[in-house]
Amino acid sequence: MSKAVLVLEDGRVFTGRPFGATGQALGEAVFSTGMSGYQETLTDPSYHRQIVVATAPQIGNTGWNGEDSESRGERIWVAGYAVRDPSPRASNWRATGTLEDELIRQRIVGIAGIDTRGVVRHLRSRGSMKAGVFSDGALAEPADLIARVRAQQSMLGADLAGEVSTAEPYVVEPDGPPGVSRFTVAALDLGIKTNTPRNFARRGIRCHVLPASTTFEQIAELNPHGVFLSNGPGDPATADHVVALTREVLGAGIPLFGICFGNQILGRALGLSTYKMVFGHRGINIPVVDHATGRVAVTAQNHGFALQGEAGQSFATPFGPAVVSHTCANDGVVEGVKLVDGRAFSVQYHPEAAAGPHDAEYLFDQFVELMAGEGR
């Protein structure tokens, strides 16, 4: 049987067998606790340059289909994939093939047959770190593989939004009669998931998806009723252009809504700083407290960076007073910020789910109400 190894930056090596394509994959080792939704995870641009370790013991049961991908063209964005027990066959009426066949087709190097729970315990205690998956002709002496892993770029300081963003603007039309829309939203693609424009479309909103390099002048030409900041990969401390753009949007009084990376961008625009978490939040059952209502929502999350702040913290900004609106019930991490006057708000989690619970989908309706109230 062929051999594959997962090599971590600190020298730990896990031995298994190839899964998917063979060769070499380098990235940051992170773990996802979702028991389902592996296709959505693999195609989420936020996982760019990361090797995802699945905590669920069996992966691939439902195969691969043409409907659940969260990237345009069904592109897999993870750098590599590590699983315990891949299902030998696909069992779902929508499946068009197996997970392994798709990994091979897209040349994603993976590893199977390793103690993924052991890897997760190691990452929980040591933190997410540089890693590599090696098989076939990429195998070498452990010292050489460790050197390759350590030589790669760190996620800290990585500016990745431009690598996953659309190169050209495109429009997602609203559901319903052609040419009829309630509002127009300018969505900045920092790694946007396809289910986000779908959520706008279901609410009768025309969504202009724009490159990460878009200027305020280009947004203003669209005369949007609101601006949306998407999820995405990398270190938000590097996204100075988007932060400056966000401040221009706030200064113009245009309603603004952000998700995940967009939450970190809005936080930075309001004066907060960011930091790299030890191992991040990646799963589909993470509880978040809304400090305005006291209610708890079960949320889908995927982030390794967060905003500095505390529950209910109020702070002054050039755009008026702001507050930390949401925090994680598990560890107190900031999960949302907003301007007190309501013109701009964001959350660290994913109300569009895909995969995950729909507890927070109402936030899209809140954004619609905000745009309606502005009367633009």
UniProtKB/Swiss-Prot annotation:
User: Which Gene3D superfamilies does this entry report, sorted A to Z?
Assistant: 3.40.50.880, Carbamoyl-phosphate synthase small subunit, N-terminal domain
Provide the residue positions that the database annotates as binding L-glutamine: 46, 232, 234, 261, 264, 302, 304-305
Q: Which domain of life is it from?
A: Bacteria
Pathway involvement? Answer: Amino-acid biosynthesis; L-arginine biosynthesis; carbamoyl phosphate from bicarbonate: step 1/1; Pyrimidine metabolism; UMP biosynthesis via de novo pathway; (S)-dihydroorotate from bicarbonate: step 1/3
Looking up PROSITE patterns in the UniProt record yields: GATASE_TYPE_1
Q: Where are the transmembrane segments?
A: none
Provide the active-site residues from the annotation.
Answer: 260 (nucleophile), 350, 352
Name of the top EC class for this enzyme? ligase
Which InterPro entries does UniProt cross-reference here? Answer: Anth_synth/Amidotransfase (IPR050472), CarbamoylP_synth_ssu (IPR006274), CarbamoylP_synth_ssu_N (IPR002474), CarbP_synth_ssu_N_sf (IPR036480), Class_I_gatase-like (IPR029062), CPSase_GATase1 (IPR035686), GATASE (IPR017926)
Q: Which GO terms describe its molecular function?
A: ATP binding; carbamoyl-phosphate synthase (glutamine-hydrolyzing) activity; glutaminase activity
Q: Which reaction does it catalyse?
A: hydrogencarbonate + L-glutamine + 2 ATP + H2O = carbamoyl phosphate + L-glutamate + 2 ADP + phosphate + 2 H(+)
- GO terms classed as biological process: 'de novo' pyrimidine nucleobase biosynthetic process; 'de novo' UMP biosynthetic process; glutamine metabolic process; L-arginine biosynthetic process
Q: Which UniProt keywords apply?
A: Amino-acid biosynthesis, Arginine biosynthesis, ATP-binding, Glutamine amidotransferase, Ligase, Nucleotide-binding, Pyrimidine biosynthesis
Record's keyword annotation contains Ligase: yes
Short name of any one Pfam family annotated for the protein: GATase
Q: What is its EC number?
A: 6.3.5.5
Is Amino-acid biosynthesis tagged as a keyword? Answer: yes
Q: Which residues form the Glutamine amidotransferase type-1 domain?
A: 184-376
Where do the record's region annotations for CPSase lie? Answer: 1-183
* Quaternary data: Composed of two chains; the small (or glutamine) chain promotes the hydrolysis of glutamine to ammonia, which is used by the large (or ammonia) chain to synthesize carbamoyl phosphate. Tetramer of heterodimers (alpha,beta)4.
**Function statement:** Small subunit of the glutamine-dependent carbamoyl phosphate synthetase (CPSase). CPSase catalyzes the formation of carbamoyl phosphate from the ammonia moiety of glutamine, carbonate, and phosphate donated by ATP, constituting the first step of 2 biosynthetic pathways, one leading to arginine and/or urea and the other to pyrimidine nucleotides. The small subunit (glutamine amidotransferase) binds and cleaves glutamine to supply the large subunit with the substrate ammonia.
Record family assignment? Belongs to the CarA family.
| Name listed for the protein in its UniProt record | Carbamoyl phosphate synthase small chain
User: The organism's lineage?
Assistant: Bacteria, Bacillati, Actinomycetota, Actinomycetes, Mycobacteriales
